Amino acid sequence: MTEVFIYDHVRTPRGRGKKDGALHEVPSVRLAAKTLEAIRDRNGLDTTTVDDIIMGCVDPVMDAGAVIPKAAAFEAGYSTRAPGMQISRFCASGLDAVNFGAGKIAQGADDIVIAGGVESMSRVGLGMSGGAWFMDPSVNFPAYFMPQGVSADLIATKYGFSRTDLDAYAVESQKRAGHAWAQGWFDKSVVPVKDQNGLTILDKDEHMRPGTDMQALASLNPSFQMPGEMGGFEAVGIQAHPEIERINYVHHAGNSSGIVDGAGVVLLGSKAGGESMGLKPRARIKAFANIGSDPALMLTGPVDVTEKLLTRTGMRLADIDLFELNEAFAAVVLRYMQAFDIDHDRINVNGGAIAMGHPLGATGAMILGTVLDELERRDLNTALVTLCIGAGMGTATVIERV
């Protein structure tokens, strides 16, 4: 098998996913093109040598449809020889794009792949692509399918996390993200988004509220009590998990991930591919895995896939220096830390999606890049990146510095 190296990564800032968000007027294809331009220019890429561009997008409809990476490559001025492929595994799409690219390189099919993702949630709303999970009772009834927020509250109830636990985690996420930005730790990987006149539209994650405290969060009402109780989904959850008498509704806007716009890509290659363009590898893809998990709990896949990946590789938790897990909801991370007895100082050390937002198809690539930068900054070696996924799945990737 051919070794797969990470040569570079970039991302846009995350803009608030609303009509008054800074990136609302920037279509998905342009967000993706900004990252393709940056990864090319930073590394002096000859784009005729790019074997594939793979990007995740969870809702590829309207102006986010029709194979965004190929359109973005045209927008960015790439050679017409560079192909593109759009994928979706819900929230893990960006990381799975990286894993798909790594697999192609490992098999010797490709030498240079750009992989990542994009989502403009202010322009294409969550769930706009529809699908059987949401609309077909022959699928969602037997699967005990529920809105993700109700599943997150089910996790909190089942594993004993209080609202105070979740809010304390959210406050820390905000503090860590604010501190990392203030220290300039994101500067080398974040590419400002500019308009056609070269004026900066956004150069910093827009969703953050680093001054958030417990008192402010205490004023927020639970977000998922109405669909749980009035929509009948609490009964679905209890049917799936009869050990639970009632769901405690503890998630709200302040301890759940932010809806945002953004894009990110990772430059992957074989040793020969990198050497042909004078690139220096920063890390290697050591292993990756996917798994299905309980569809009612839905968001516990990171625990299951981490166990699978460690078993497959013979690695131990002690071999991992840092962990990155998408903060879809605070209970997701708390359950992961509980399951593996991981100290908070090893996971999401620069904050996460509660603070900075979760641009669905892009997040996996973004957090892989974030943890690589942090490994380098701390002079550490190995990281595990994992994401929970709608419908009950998990994806994980292990990287190590070279």
For every predicted segment, state its role.
Residues 9-12, 16-19, 102-159, 226-229, ...:
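Glycine-rich loop/linker segments at domain edges
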Residues 10-13, 24-34, 42-44, 168-271, ...:
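N-terminal extracellular/periplasmic Venus flytrap/periplasmic-binding protein-like
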Residues 22-113, 117-134, 138, 190-204, ...:
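Conserved beta-ketoacyl condensing-enzyme motif
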Residues 27, 57-111, 131, 143-150, ...:
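Conserved catalytic cysteine-centered active-site region
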Residues 28-44, 68-72, 97, 149-155, ...:
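Short, well-ordered amphipathic alpha-helical segments that serve as non-catalytic structural scaffolds
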Residues 87-118, 156-186, 265-272, 359-380, ...:
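Active-site-proximal alpha-helical scaffold in enzymes
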Residues 271-319, 337:
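Glycine- and Gly-Pro-enriched alpha-helical subdomains that act as flexible
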